[in-house]
Amino acid sequence: WRLSMEPFVEQIWRHPVKSLGAEKVNSVTLTKGETLPWDRVWALTYENSRFDISNPVWSPCSVFLRGSIAPLFLAVTAKVIELDGSIEFNHPKLKSIHLNLYDQLDRQEFIKWVAPICPENAPKPSKLCRVIGRGMTDTDYPSISINSISSLTDLSNRMNKHLHPRRFRGNIWIDGLKPWSELE
């Protein structure tokens, strides 16, 4: 913990599958105009989703299964093996699984793996999809979410409840600033 009021990067998170698996990383190389590497590379569509698998382009989050629909998704952790592009997924209620989502059979295996943590009244998972060259962020342009630890701490104190950074799905968490100074 630092006492200065100089901003510094406290945490870096990426989410290889949108809303399904967070991974804390120590460092990352950023490229102007691109999402954080390995962030939201994949997204999970549901039956009758409007996402066009045959012409994959950026789409709003409403066409994907996500934590607001399936809250148990938020407990998934991921570890990207950058050497081969495979990902290890873990969830407290499921057996760990290690897959290469570039492989069709592994994508089908992922859908089977995630099905038990989908609510019964929610749309059923259908296909894992991606858009070449960008992550499936919530913006229609490649973006990186930068959040403030001090603002999160202040919000937690006001709510009298610990809020974990993973709840907000941010990429880069900075600290060393006054709460809410990012809004000034």
Language-model features: where?
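Electropositive, beta-rich accessory/interaction domains or terminal extensions
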Residues: 5-182
